[in-house]
Amino acid sequence: MNFNNFTIKSQEAVQEAVNLVQSRGQQAIEPAHILHGVMKVGENVTNFIFQKLGMNGQQVALVVDKQIESLPKVSGGEPYLSRESNEVLQKATQYSKEMGDEFVSLEHILLALLTVKSTVSTILKDAGMTEKELRNAINELRKGEKVTSQSSEDNYQSLEKYAINLNEAARSGKLDPVIGRDEEIRRVLQILSRRTKNNPILIGEPGTGKTAIVEGLAHRILRGDVPENLKNKQVYSLDMGALVAGAKYKGEFEERLKSVVNEVKKSEGDIILFIDEIHTLVGAGKGEGAMDAANILKPALARGELRSIGATTLDEYQKYFEKDKALERRFQIVQVDEPDTLSTISILRGLKERYENHHHVRIKDDAIIAAVELSSRYITDRFLPDKAIDLMDEAAAKLRMEVDSVPEELDEISRKIKQLEIEREAIKRENDKPKLEIIGKELAELKEVEKSFKAKWQSEKTLMDKIQQNKVEIENLKFEAEKAEREGDYGKVAEIRYGKLQALDKEIEDTQEKLRGMQGDKAMIKEEVDAEDIADVVSRWTGIPVSKMMQSEKDKLLHLEDELHQRVIGQDEAIEAVADAVRRSRAGLQDPKRPIGSFIFLGTTGVGKTELAKALAEFLFDDESMMTRIDMSEYQEKHSVSRLVGAPPGYVGYDEGGQLTEAIRRKPYSVVLFDEIEKAHPDVFNILLQVLDDGRLTDNKGRVVNFKNTIIIMTSNMGSSYIQSQMEKLSGSNKEEVIEETKKEVMNMLKKNIRPEFLNRIDETIMFLPLTETEIRQIVLLQIKGVQKMLAENGVELEMTDAALNFLSQVGYDPEFGARPVKRAIQRYLLNDLSKKLLSQEVDRSKAIIVDSNGDGLVFRN
């Protein structure tokens, strides 16, 4: 027998029969073995045929297996085809020629198994198979196609295998309702009604609802709310994954796609093919000698034989379609723009019920409004309605987890009970009866409280679950009513709408009343998603604090100046300006189109300009390293400017992004410090103009980075020598005049060096004054606290006398260099000598070390 003219599936079926013979210890390959092989290898073929003929495939398989088991067992021989099996395969070859096929397929073998007289033909006839019905089923399966390749069976029912029927999905309630988008759906219907080139392509940003428009079309077709020429049409969504998966041989992918196209063509306009991410077809399957998948579609698309809807993003359309003009002209563009906030709110209101039934919680209307407003303000790299839906979904999931978990009060009581029980066991051993009685009494009280709490929690949970079950039932009944209305069963519609639904609504109302009565003023379970839950999710996503402030945080913000003064000594004007900006932001009064605040700090070196930025970062994020610091001395050359936003295409480092833009994309809520701006190239200021004005910056990949939640601080030593010389003139009487005059002159210097359009965008320009001796002494105290803390970690206690502090203040005071000499003085006079004394054991580290001054230096004693 020559198996070269058999399809791959037919060869596999015969091989399966051989394997079965060997595994059962038999020798002759009987028709029963071949039928077993056909049913195992060609499930899609036999299942379709058995279904069409009303046969029970599982029952047939059991009878065949019993027949195989009854065949004689022979050991040691080579498997061979029995006379009947040989006749079956010969007959199958004959049938393939009769039908005009090039290869013997599984249907030919099945037809031969029925017509060649054997026990198997009897089994098939008894199960209800006749030759005429089998031939009809084969024709229906093939849809008029001939077997022209060895993988032909893979292409039967190709739409069922490689596409998803959206009409069926809508009919069974698997698709979410589509709210709005009427204009876009109308445009799609208009294009689909054309004679040729009737292929709309939906183009829009990710998450704007392109796929939802096609789902909306499927819903409309189901309701009959479409023009006459589109009524009863089927919408199939092409599954690219299934199309490519398992295509091992060259040309197999193209063959599958061709069979899908042919099936759509044969429907004569009854099938509309939806290709999501259509750009994946351009270049798919292309290789040595193979044709691009898009080229297979082109002829059918141009002639109007294939009605298809594509969906892709703007970027992908430009990248793939605009290069291929022949493909581009076959599609008509439907622009899908991001909906505005009002449209998005109505979309979320329409979806609310679906999410409530899924999560078994209620979603308040203010949560929907908050989801839209907060997502459009703070999540700028994604699009509505997708990001707002995600917020609502996650907030509901979070609340559901809390509902299913034990309430916090109950958990605390349970932990306390466990702790007391452990204590009681320990005291039992000591035989301390009075203590045992006290603990026993406390335990009994706590257990009573726990019992009542548990009962209340369980009761609330039971009532909530009952409400949600009723809501799910309502949704199912509404779906049933819609189905009955489509089928014209108006009696059932009336029974559901005016009977069952009203009864369930009443039941929900009664249960809610009961729940409210049980909860009173204090509910144990929170059952509603509110705006605060949404704000909490936004904070987790972005790190931006948008949730309501606790009282402790309000107090902290009101006394922010004191917090900052713990690290920065003096400079009241600067601290007040920064604190006001932070308070405006947290109170929701900042301009939403600009950064929280932008400042230029001027002054001599070492007066606290950079330290204030660090102190602010520590206050906001509990970690000063959360500050994004850009040292402008690194940007002195013109070409180095590109490092801020990323190298242009074609240059090394293009994929890495910019130092500034990447830092803010990852941490949108941060303090950005541009240190020593006078050292930067003038072109850097051009880049910063749009950051200060619009709170946005476009990086090298065209992504817009949002700076609206950043505090921008720039420091400069400009005019420091002038400030220094002026401060020497200070005396008690003329202090205010000299400071004002100095500020005026420094501002003039700033205007000469930095362009007016840049300075005009800065919120406040603040001059830091040189530090006085009193302030230097405070800085010494601050730094000594740090030293004491460090020594305490090593078990050494350090005490400073006033004389020692005064000495360090004197040697550390240098008006020209600010506070930096203090650190050097502490290192030189205190730490260096102390380390020597500790190593030589001149001082006892187990006792407190007292540091005093003799006027020339520091002395150490215990």
Swiss-Prot record:
Residues 6-71 are annotated as: Repeat 1. Residues 157-338 are annotated as: NBD1. Residues 81-144 are annotated as: Repeat 2. Residues 553-770 are annotated as: NBD2. Transmembrane segments: none annotated. It comes from the Bacteria. One of its GO terms (biological process) is protein refolding. PANTHER family: ATP-DEPENDENT CLP PROTEASE, HEAT SHOCK PROTEIN 104. This is Chaperone protein ClpB. The gene is clpB.
